[in-house]
Amino acid sequence: LERLDLNKPVMITEGPIDSLFLDNAIALAGADADIKINHEQCTMIFDNEPRNKEIVNRMINAVDKNFNLVVWPKTLRYKDINDIIISGKTSAEIQTLISNNTHSGLTALQHINNWKRI
């Protein structure tokens, strides 16, 4: 938490290793924490597991709590940010991928419905 700048947008990843590759990021490590910062300044980044009911439900819950949410493109073959790094992509490329796939509100719910496979 000491490396977070709460005056900037915050990225919240599912896994601690994933958070190491992003600017101003922390990890929930599978927990459903009640974050004490403005949810609208946070972007939740879950693993790319469209068949995982728990992840889909947590994504919907994050949108209901006014978090921004990354919904990975269907063409992405990797499970998480760490896998994307291993594939040879840079942190900057991942930041762009995240920016291009961040949604909120009804738009996020629509993207979740198109992404999920359950």
PLM region spans:
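Charged, flexible boundary elements
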Residues: 1-2
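TOPRIM fold recognition
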Residues: 6-10, 16-118
